[in-house]
Amino acid sequence: MAPIRVLSLVLPILSTVTLLLTQFGECNNGRRSGDAVDTDFSGFSVPLEHSFEVDDVPRFRLRGALQFRGGRENSVYLSQNQLSEKDRNTLKDVAAVDGLYRIRVPRVSLQVDRQTERQYEGYLTAFVRACALVESHLSDVITLHTDVSGYVIGISIVTIPGSCRGIEVEDEVDLEVFNTTISVMAPVTAPVPETAPYIERMEMEMEKKGKNPQEQKSFFAKYWMYIVPLVLFLMMSGAQDQSGGGAGGGAANGGGR
């Protein structure tokens, strides 16, 4: 009887503990164990392709993948393949004839919620001199340019250093792994002209002129007391000169007779 009585007391306690553990396990910040993680950790990837040919005819192949992460600020990560021995030799041959090294990415939107029915809308291409890439030991900087809606509208690539100086490079040591810095550049909003303060200042000046009508008078209305005497003086002086000239002319004519 004693073991049965003890068991009857223990079972309710175990059931209560089990119930508490079950409720605590479901409390996961409003997200169940089967739900997806936050959108800040979700994303998508697009291929990064490159082409370097001696005949300068682009034939793109996979270089790596751009992995985009959603969130307040678009972030991008790049995973790249190593160059094979054949690719290293081809790249050096292209550099020897001053050929071009090209890259391209599809034109997509960086907004994760727009990737459900994503379709590529063409490609964006950039290039650099192959000799500059070789002499930089595959060190390049790739920048993706987006518009205000988040679509990729441009891509640029530069090497460090960016010039060709004819330096010999050991392909097995320096031409195997890319050293790439990649970033996303969004458009910068231009400063808005301060039209409101200008209009307010103009209205204040108009109000001041309305309160002081003396400032609204014309030039003649302000200085007529000086202009009129001057005009009369000039008129009188001109009349005196004409009368004096006529008298002198008559005397001269009379003396001639």
Swiss-Prot record:
Lumenal topology: which positions?
A: 24-218
Q: Which Pfam families does UniProt cross-reference here?
A: ECM10 (PF21203)
Q: Which residues cross the membrane?
A: 219-239
Q: Where in the cell is it found?
A: Endoplasmic reticulum membrane
Q: What is annotated about its quaternary structure and interactions? A: Component of the ER membrane protein complex (EMC).
Q: What is the originating organism of this protein?
A: Danio rerio (Zebrafish)
Put simply, this protein is called: ER membrane protein complex subunit 10
Where mainly located?
endoplasmic reticulum
The family annotation for this protein states: Belongs to the EMC10 family.
GO terms for biological process? Answer: protein insertion into ER membrane by stop-transfer membrane-anchor sequence; tail-anchored membrane protein insertion into ER membrane
Q: Which residues lie on this side of the membrane: Cytoplasmic?
A: 240-257
